[in-house]
Each structure stands twice: as C-alpha cells, then as structure tokens.
C-alpha cells in the first residue's frame, strides 16, 4: 500500500481546498483561498514546486487534471464564478515532461456565483468538463476541433454543490449480447435542495436533460460520486449535511430503478470517493477522519477501516 506523503511547505498563504494527482501520479496540483494554484513534481518521497498559476479573483475550490490523451490540461474553479482551463505548452515534441510553460487557454465566466465543483468526463466520451455552481446552473464545456464550446442550464433551485460523471460504458455492457450501444454521456448532481438528479445527453437535440430525481436526504447534498464499476450494477454515493451517506444502487436489468442504503455518521459529511475499481467507498466529514466501506455478500455496506492522522 502506498504511503501518504505530507507536503508541509505548500507555499500557499491560506487554506488549501483541493489537491489532485495527474494521471501518472507524477504531478500534484493544489488550490487555495490565496487565489492561486500550485503544481508540484512528485518523485519518490520528494516534491518540488514547479509552477504557481494566478488568474482567479477569489478562493479556488477545485482542481482537476484532464486525461493525458488531450494534452497536459488542468481545470480550476473558484468562488469568483469562473472556470479556467490551463495548458502546459512544450517548445518541442521531445521536451521532457514538466519543462513546458503553463498558459491559460480558456476563461469561462458565465456563472453568476461560486463554481463549487468541476469534473472531467470519461475520456472515451470526449474532452468534456462539467461544472456545478451556486447560481443553480450546470455548465458543460467541450474541447473539439481545437476550440471550446459550452452549454449551461438550470439544475437545482438553491444551488449545485457537486457533480460526477457515470462511466462511459453502461453496467452489463461488457457481457451484453448487444455490445455496440456506444458511449453514454451521463452524470449526477447534488444540490442544496437536498436532491440528486441524473442527467442524460440527447444526441438528437444536443442537450442534457434531467431523467431522474433521487430523494432521501433531509439537508444539503455536499458531494456525489458515481462508481467507475461497469459490472452488473450502477452505484452512486451521496454525502449530506444531514450526517448520512446514501449508496444508491441500480441493477443493469432495471437501470432506472434506484434503491438506497443509508450509512449514518456522528458528523456532517463533506466528501465521498470510490476506489479505481469501484468496490471501496471512502467517506470524510467534519471529524477529520476517513472511513472505508465495502459491500458484503448480502448486499449491505459495512465499514472495513478508519483512517485518521
């Protein structure tokens, strides 16, 4: 198991809100209330600050690396209502990784309030970034034919806190008798209206439409995470201000029928995150602990480990 690396000298002048490793685990991006993003090179047990990105006018909540097939691209979102896309430009194709200069290649500023979370779609569906804002809207940015386009639409009346894409392949498609169905564009949002909504892309109208609403939480939905598993079931985890996590499950044979299991905690919950294989769920909240959960053979979710510093 990989050991945790502590970056004590982050260089930030204020609270750090998010951190993310790139696809290869060689670089770490962090963002802070000091309005900056910092990029570190990670090698073994050492790290080196290589770049500070400035462009936001408020606290930066979220940083997300794109898949490397699209280049070295980082997206950031902020309290200032902006989503910025940064790209590392190399002088030549043989230049080593980390040697390029970072530039801001797109500035999306149509949201009228804080952009709380951003999420890249599975790379099989294209270079797509979904953004969740306190103005109640979701935007989807797409990079295609060397230019950026966008859609923006209303999602939750009291604000959108979180967003997560479904896997590109639908559950059961790997063992389906009709495997050529294609890649789905689908995501889930969590809002301050206590609801989750599932959105599907309609290629004919080229719009995203809310196809399902999941009710159960009694307070704000702080985070949502769609499991990357594409076996026989779909799983969505949601973390709420109501001190519960719900694990929503839909079987491949009846994909529109979602049931949920409630996991109760003693504190407000902030984040949920799935392991790469989609079988272990990590939960973190106001007690500064992380707990790991797994589904047993009876279909019940049980805690397998507590992690605390």
Curated annotation (Swiss-Prot):
GO terms for cellular component: COPII vesicle coat; endoplasmic reticulum membrane; GATOR2 complex; nuclear pore; nuclear pore outer ring. It is a peripheral membrane protein. SMART domains: WD40. One of its GO terms (molecular function) is structural molecule activity. It is found in: Cytoplasmic vesicle, COPII-coated vesicle membrane; Endoplasmic reticulum membrane; Nucleus, Nuclear pore complex. WD repeats lie at residues 11-50, 55-96, 110-151, 155-209, 216-258, 264-303. Keywords: Cytoplasmic vesicle, Endoplasmic reticulum, ER-Golgi transport, Membrane, mRNA transport, Nuclear pore complex, Nucleus, Protein transport, Repeat, Translocation, Transport, WD repeat. GO terms for biological process: COPII-coated vesicle budding; ERAD pathway; mRNA transport; nuclear pore localization; positive regulation of DNA-templated transcription; positive regulation of ER to Golgi vesicle-mediated transport; positive regulation of protein exit from endoplasmic reticulum; positive regulation of TOR signaling. Component of the coat protein complex II (COPII) which promotes the formation of transport vesicles from the endoplasmic reticulum (ER). The coat has two main functions, the physical deformation of the endoplasmic reticulum membrane into vesicles and the selection of cargo molecules. It also functions as a component of the nuclear pore complex (NPC). NPC components, collectively referred to as nucleoporins (NUPs), can play the role of both NPC structural components and of docking or interaction partners for transiently associated nuclear transport factors. Belongs to the WD repeat SEC13 family. The COPII coat is composed of at least 5 proteins: the SEC23/24 complex, the SEC13/31 complex, and the protein SAR1. Component of the nuclear pore complex (NPC). NPC constitutes the exclusive means of nucleocytoplasmic transport. NPCs allow the passive diffusion of ions and small molecules and the active, nuclear transport receptor-mediated bidirectional transport of macromolecules such as proteins, RNAs, ribonucleoparticles (RNPs), and ribosomal subunits across the nuclear envelope. Due to its 8-fold rotational symmetry, all subunits are present with 8 copies or multiples thereof. This is Protein transport protein sec13.
């Amino acid at each position: 198991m990989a050991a945790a690396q502590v970056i004590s000298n982050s260089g930030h002048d204020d609270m750090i809100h998010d951190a993310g490793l790139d696809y290869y685990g060689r670089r770490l991006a962090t963002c802070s209330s000091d309005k900056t993003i910092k990029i570190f090179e990670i090698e073994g047990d050492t790290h080196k600050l290589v770049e500070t990105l400035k462009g936001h006018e408020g606290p930066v909540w979220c940083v997300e690396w794109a898949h490397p097939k699209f280049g070295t691209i980082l997206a950031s979102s902020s309290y200032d209502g902006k989503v910025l896309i940064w790209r590392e430009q190399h002088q030549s194709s043989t230049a080593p990784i980390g040697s390029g200069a970072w530039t801001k290649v797109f500035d999306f500023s149509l949201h009228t309030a804080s952009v709380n979370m951003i999420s890249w779609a599975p790379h099989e569906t294209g270079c797509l970034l979904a953004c969740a804002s306190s103005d109640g809207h979701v935007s989807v940015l797409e990079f295609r034919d060397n230019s950026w386009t966008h859609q923006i639409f209303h999602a939750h009346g009291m604000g959108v806190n979180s967003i997560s894409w479904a896997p590109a392949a639908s559950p059961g498609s790997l063992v389906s008798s009709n495997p050529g169905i294609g890649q789905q564009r689908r995501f889930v949002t969590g809002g301050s209206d206590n609801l989750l909504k599932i959105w599907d892309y309609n290629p004919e109208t080229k719009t995203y439409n809310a196809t399902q609403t999941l009710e159960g939480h009694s307070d704000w939905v702080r985070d949502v995470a769609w499991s990357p598993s594409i076996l026989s079931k779909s799983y969505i985890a949601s973390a709420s201000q109501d001190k519960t996590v719900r694990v929503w499950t839909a079987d491949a044979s009846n994909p529109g029928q979602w049931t949920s299991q409630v996991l109760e905690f003693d504190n407000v919950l902030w984040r949920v995150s799935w392991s790469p294989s989609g079988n272990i769920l990590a939960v973190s909240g106001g007690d500064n602990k992380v707990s790991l959960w797994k589904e047993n053979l009876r279909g019940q979710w049980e805690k397998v480990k507590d992690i605390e510093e």
